[in-house]
Amino acid sequence: AVKPSAILATNTSYLDIDEIASATQRPTQVLGLHFFSPAHIMKLLEVVRGKATAQDVMDACLAVGKKIGKEAVLAGNCHGFIGNRMLEKYSRQSREVVLEGATPWEVDQALQGFGMAMGPYRMYDVVGVDLGWRSRQLAGVGRGEPIVWLDNKLCEMERFGQKSGHGFYKYEAGSRQAIHDPETDMMAREVAEEAGYTARDVSSDEIVTRCILALVNEGARILDEGYAESAEDIDRVYRFGYGFPAERGG
């Protein structure tokens, strides 16, 4: 057992902090400390407040984050908090443009050209393409929306990303270097046609505009709803947690 004054912190990236707190005798001492992976490299730490979290508990955790060299940002308790809630909108656009005619490689090239540290499809390979696929299986939702049909197809072929040596990209043994795979492009087109899409040319400018504005719009909603303390905090989340280019203003 922990002492009564102990802070109870969870590293969850999505679970409801208030629901976790409701299962304890001390909801005022419960909050989220969402470290970003890989934690020894990524500087962001989301400190997620629940409805009952005491101010001194939040202050203590923000101070701890600063002491260990993190960019600690206070976030409200909503699905995905600040960073992952915005990421969902960005990811949706990155997948929609592929259904419409772009390839995963073209999407990554466009966004890395804009200044992102890593394109979304390279990110999916690093995180693991199978994470969403397995959660869909557990939830019993079948194939899900067309935007994830390509992921499903890759996973059915055991192409789970970097860890399996093949995902949206190919990887040589012992290497993390992503190699463009034309087979992925062909599968993306097949999936889009199956979903009823007719391919068109999608420019790099359109890819960047749609993906980045999805981030901007969701960030504005989060600020308006009070889940972020300031626009600067949202900038810090994306610069230090997701590799948004500082020269673009955060």
Roles of regions detected by a PLM:
Residues 1-250:
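N-terminal glycine-rich phosphate-binding loop for ADP-containing cofactors
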